[in-house]
Amino acid sequence: MADKTKILIIGGTGYIGKFIVEASAKSEHPTFALARESTISDPVKGKIIQGFKNSGVTILTGDLYDHESLVKAIKQVDVVISTVGQLQLADQVKIIAAIKEAGNVKRFFPSDFGTDVDRCHAVEPAKSSFEIKSQIRRAIEAEGIPYTFVSANYFAGYSLPTLVQPEVTAPPRDKVIILGDGNAKAVFNEENDIGTYTIKAVDDARTLNKILYIKPPKNIYSFNELVALWEKKIGKTLEKIYVPEEQVLKQIQESPFPINIVMAINHSAFVKGDLTNFKIEPSFGVEASELYPDVKYTTVEEYLDQFV
């Protein structure tokens, strides 16, 4: 185990961060998570930290905004994975600066994990958020830091339990709202699989300075196909309400935060088809299920079974 790549996760108690920490610990990489004192003592996040410790994760006390603590943590590892949330995306320049100073990092994974921000046509407010991710990518490239950008598309846990329906907590049983014409294809990945694929990429020369797209063939569905699959599972035909693009754009403008950002992401994926309207070229990207055929990923069909 001594020669296994040491991995530091920054933002490990966040939504996708937890899955990446778990995948790293499970794969027997020496795993480190950076946490603030306030996170460790927090009643909710403290439990997550304790869970990490129980899995053999080393907790390093530090802060994104404390340069010395960042450098000190980074010097102990080989690979840095950032899973910081929306509000800290721009502050990843601090991680970049610390990586440059530490000088020992073999790979940096910034907090990406969604749509490929360099190949999308999102409207505000998602546009600004994607632009920040894009700026971080350019900063990493400019500094010559070895990287992998993970494009994980939709998190299944965010989208499939409601079949991408707004402001509900269960999948539809009567009627379903479909954005656009319902034909643009999107991609849905179970969070544990995102963690597994990300950690597999850590030591892989094929993913160095590339975008790792998580697009397993059985998880690519248009809205219409997703609805048809659900109808088959529940043995019932749903009433379909199609929302034309102009109306989707109007709803985005009129909705409060954070509903508007979710709607803008859905518009990008389901109206513009931004998750699938380009070909992955070897010059910039690789696809996870092709690289790692041994990973038995959860399919959309299997995932939906729990809600029937």
Curated annotation (Swiss-Prot):
Keywords: Allergen, Cytoplasm, NADP, Oxidoreductase
Xref: Gene3D superfamilies: NAD(P)-binding Rossmann-like Domain, UDP-galactose 4-epimerase, domain 1
Coiled coil: none
Domain of life of the source: Eukaryota
Subcellular location: Cytoplasm
Residues the record marks as active site: K133
GO MF annotations in UniProt: oxidoreductase activity
Additional notes on this entry: The catalytic tetrad is probably composed of Lys-133, Tyr-158, Ser-159 and Asn-153.
Subunit structure: Homodimer.
Record's protein name: Isoflavone reductase-like protein
Taxonomic source organism: Olea europaea
